[in-house]
Structure formats: structure tokens, C-alpha cells
Amino acid sequence: MSDGGAPTVEFLRHGGRIAMAHRGFTSFRLPMNSMGAFQEAAKLGFRYIETDVRATRDGVAVILHDRRLAPGVGLSGAVDRLDWRDVRKAQLGAGQSIPTLEDLLTALPDMRVNIDIKAASAIEPTVNVIERCNAHNRVLIGSFSERRRRRALRLLTKRVASSAGTGALLAWLTARPLGSRAYAWRMMRDIDCVQLPSRLGGVPVITPARVRGFHAAGRQVHAWTVDEPDVMHTLLDMDVDGIITDRADLLRDVLIARGEWDGA
């Protein structure tokens, strides 16, 4: 396996494949993005998890994918129009409530957390938690929005790992002429890794040539969200640096079979 270039940020310094549990591991009974799911991933030996952060109306960074609360949690509405004192009462099922980002970083101090900032209102609350927990070395900031990602990086007082937003990735993937390719690399100058789907609309996105190209530029390549063992093997054979999965149990089995599991 290539090292994808020497990582300059602690988050990516691992020495092996990065196995990342997407919103934790449910064990087929726990809600995604719950503290129980994160703890299940830790029990499996995972050292990396991916999660989503939004903010309540009063500025508390919470672990939540969708803006609107799901039916059946005992509360309705958009999380950014509700205060934390109310959101904390929502029940996700299996005895789980909505955790805060600070809950997660505090409860699992050795876990590295890939944070997808889902809304502009969550930027400052996320930054404040990272600063308060001094968690710069164990978080990665990502977002589908380049504007959100870059604003978070500007507000943080220390360097953190970052993955490319959709705009930067599209610029790189569609660049053809030399001038366009130079622009694409400028778009990605402040990122440490790319996190890509293996396929998009049936078209391969991660290819051996692209993996080699990103490695040559010193960027790691992480594939998401991969739940099939045969696809995991194919991507690992392409030399991807990490895989993000809903099936942490299967990824663990695949890495064990390849002799590449070291507690993720």
C-alpha cells in the first residue's frame, strides 16, 4: 500500500488502511449517529468514525444528518429552529438521544472524528467545540460546501485535517486542459485527502489512475460509502488509503482476511 504521500496532519497518520465507521455502527439495533452506535464502533476496534453536525437555534453543535427531526422522536421541526433544551429530549429509539459533538469528543477521547458540517449555522458551534476540547489533531473537517469547509478552517486556531468539498472534486475530475487542471489543483490546495464514491451513476469515480494521481500530489484517497466486501477488496487492490462504511463488521472482516487489520 502506498502511503499517499507523507501526511502532514496527525489525523491521517495511521500506518495502515483507515477504516471509518459511517455514523458509527448500529449492530442492527441502534440508530445511526447515536452515542450507542459510536461506542459499538469503538468496541469493534475502530479508531475512525464519520458523522454529521448541525446546530440548534441556541448554538449547540449536535450530531444529526437531516435538518428536520425524524417522525416518532417525540419532537418535530427543524433543529436550527429549536433550542437544545428541547432537542435533547428527542428519542431516537433503543434508548438513544441526540448527542452533542462535545459529548462524542469527550466520551471517546481516542476516537478520530470525520465531521461533515451540514449547514452554515453549524460552523461556529463546531469550531467552538473543537477549540474547547483541543481536538484539532483528531478531527477532519469536510462538507459538501466549499464555503462552509473553508470558513471553518479559517476560524480554527490550529491546523486540522480537511477533505475536499464537492466543488473542488468536480473541478478536479472534470479538468482537461492544462489551465483547467492547474485551477483544479488550486481549488484543492488546502485539502489533505479526497473522499469519493466508488461509482456515480454507474460510472467509476475511483480508478487506479486517479488514485495514483492523488497519491502523486500527496493526497490520500478514501472511498464512501462501501458496504459490499467484493467492492472493498477491489478498492483496496487499487490502493485506496481508507474506506468509509455502514458495515463496520464486514470491513473489519475484509481487513483481517487481508492481514491489514490493526484495530483500524
From Swiss-Prot:
Location of the GP-PDE domain: 17-255
Disulfide bond positions: none
Annotated active site residues, numbered on this chain, are H22, H65
Q: Which residues form a coiled coil?
A: none
- MF annotations from Gene Ontology: metal ion binding; phosphoric diester hydrolase activity
InterPro entries according to UniProt = GP_PDE_dom, PLC-like_Pdiesterase_TIM-brl
EC number, as in UniProt: 3.1.4.46
The protein's superkingdom reads Bacteria
- Binding residues for a divalent metal cation, per the UniProt record? E50, D52, H65
User: Required cofactors, per record?
Assistant: a divalent metal cation
Q: What class of enzyme is it?
A: hydrolase
Whether Cell division counts among this entry's keywords is: no
Q: Which UniProt keywords apply?
A: Hydrolase, Metal-binding
Biological processes per GO annotation: lipid metabolic process
Write down the chemical reaction(s) this protein catalyses: a sn-glycero-3-phosphodiester + H2O = an alcohol + sn-glycerol 3-phosphate + H(+)
Report the protein's function: Glycerophosphodiester phosphodiesterase hydrolyzes glycerophosphodiesters into glycerol-3-phosphate (G3P) and the corresponding alcohol.
Family stated for the protein in its record: Belongs to the glycerophosphoryl diester phosphodiesterase family.
- Protein name per Swiss-Prot or TrEMBL: Probable glycerophosphodiester phosphodiesterase 2
Task: Tell me which species this is from.
Answer: Mycobacterium tuberculosis (strain ATCC 25618 / H37Rv)
Q: Which gene encodes it?
A: glpQ2
